[in-house]
């Protein structure tokens, strides 16, 4: 192994959840696969576009299983590991569960990265697992062309507290717990154009565990959960709408954004994944006539380790937002509503 230490982002053709296959491509691939639902205990399988698989063990216990991995979104190896681990664990929280262990997924170009750099990536991931109170109990590694890191995560949940993305009810309020703009920031990082202070803001958001999801799922007034990741707030909101057979309305002025996301998006720091996302689902999104393209693409911006999108009883929304903010998610707010109608998203000013 040599001692070269190039920028991690220079070794990857894409980074973070922006590496995900476009929604339309993924749908086409899954359409040719048999649905994994002939098992009575499999409460959530691969036919639901949900965040994780859920298997009911008995009357009191469900096992939640998920995996998530990607290429670098930042150049600091420890931060890359931390972000990837936070993102992977999030799927368990988004289903209403609590993680119990993780397995590392590691692919590294060993002729390009030295052992110290790779070790820092693993240390970063392990530090987040420790924060979540779980061990990295094993894993698998390969020599790969691009750096890849992530986790397979197992969690537990009571059957009554499983929260799917398809449980939204007409009249529900929609809450978002983190700011949008991680993809925009990552595009600026690639071009060495991220303003001062924004890197710390981005790391603070992407390494903040979504552990509030398990607390929210214990509340019967919370009807559905999902995390906002590579398909953007529009894409994951649309998954909610389709799974619930309802129409969602998002108010643009209420959506929280990272502090410089608007400025950077207007300057053209847009990822290719934003365009692919929009091409996949734009036909089911109704936008204001005067919305500029950069704002449209910002709503399709791929989030890495994004926040939770929560559907809850409208009369409880204010109290839930306050609870979420006090738990350490200061940008949380009510961003929209659900109503009877065709499965689509309408964006209003």
From Swiss-Prot:
EC numbers on record: 2.7.9.3
Binding site for ATP: 20, 48-50, 68, 91, 139-141
Catalytic reaction annotation: hydrogenselenide + ATP + H2O = selenophosphate + AMP + phosphate + 2 H(+)
A family per Pfam: AIRS_C
Keyword set includes Transmembrane: no
Cofactor info, note text: Binds 1 Mg(2+) ion per monomer.
Gene Ontology molecular function: any one: magnesium ion binding
Keywords: ATP-binding, Kinase, Magnesium, Metal-binding, Nucleotide-binding, Plasmid, Selenium, Transferase
Residues reported to bind Mg(2+): 51, 91, 227
Any GO CC annotation of this UniProt entry: cytoplasm
Cofactor: Mg(2+)
Site (Important for catalytic activity): 20
A single GO BP: selenocysteine biosynthetic process
Active-site residues from the entry: 17
Subunit structure, interactors included: Homodimer.
Family, as annotated: Belongs to the selenophosphate synthase 1 family. Class I subfamily.
Function: Synthesizes selenophosphate from selenide and ATP.
HAMAP family membership: SelD
Protein name: Selenide, water dikinase
UniProt source species: Rhizobium meliloti (strain 1021) (Ensifer meliloti)
